[in-house]
Amino acid sequence: MFILGKSNYTNFIYGHLVIRHIKYKLFDDYKKLIKKLSSKLKTSNSTKANLGDNFSLTLPTWPFFILSWFLHIRTLEFSSNGNKTANSISSVFFLFPKLLNVV
């Protein structure tokens, strides 16, 4: 998928770049997914999580925040085996919408 460098530092940089690409692709996919779901659900009160007076967050966005947090933590942990990390994380992220049966 990407070229492995000669040192742990370059492997970490390559892995970080691949994971950033996955993050941005996932964000675009979830924006499309949220638009599709919000048009189907017609934004009733039961589909919102009210977190204050002026702030409400639709429930389909929660998986994105949880998974992006997990991805950020895992990015910081791995240095030398970036290839395995990128492959495992990308498979989890691209299969998650399929598990929801929405995409």
Swiss-Prot record:
Subcellular location: Plastid, Chloroplast
GO CC aspect terms: chloroplast
Keywords: Chloroplast, Plastid
Keyword Chloroplast found: yes
Location (main, coarse): plastid
Record flagged with keyword Chloroplast: yes
Protein name: Uncharacterized 11.9 kDa protein in 16S-23S DNA spacer
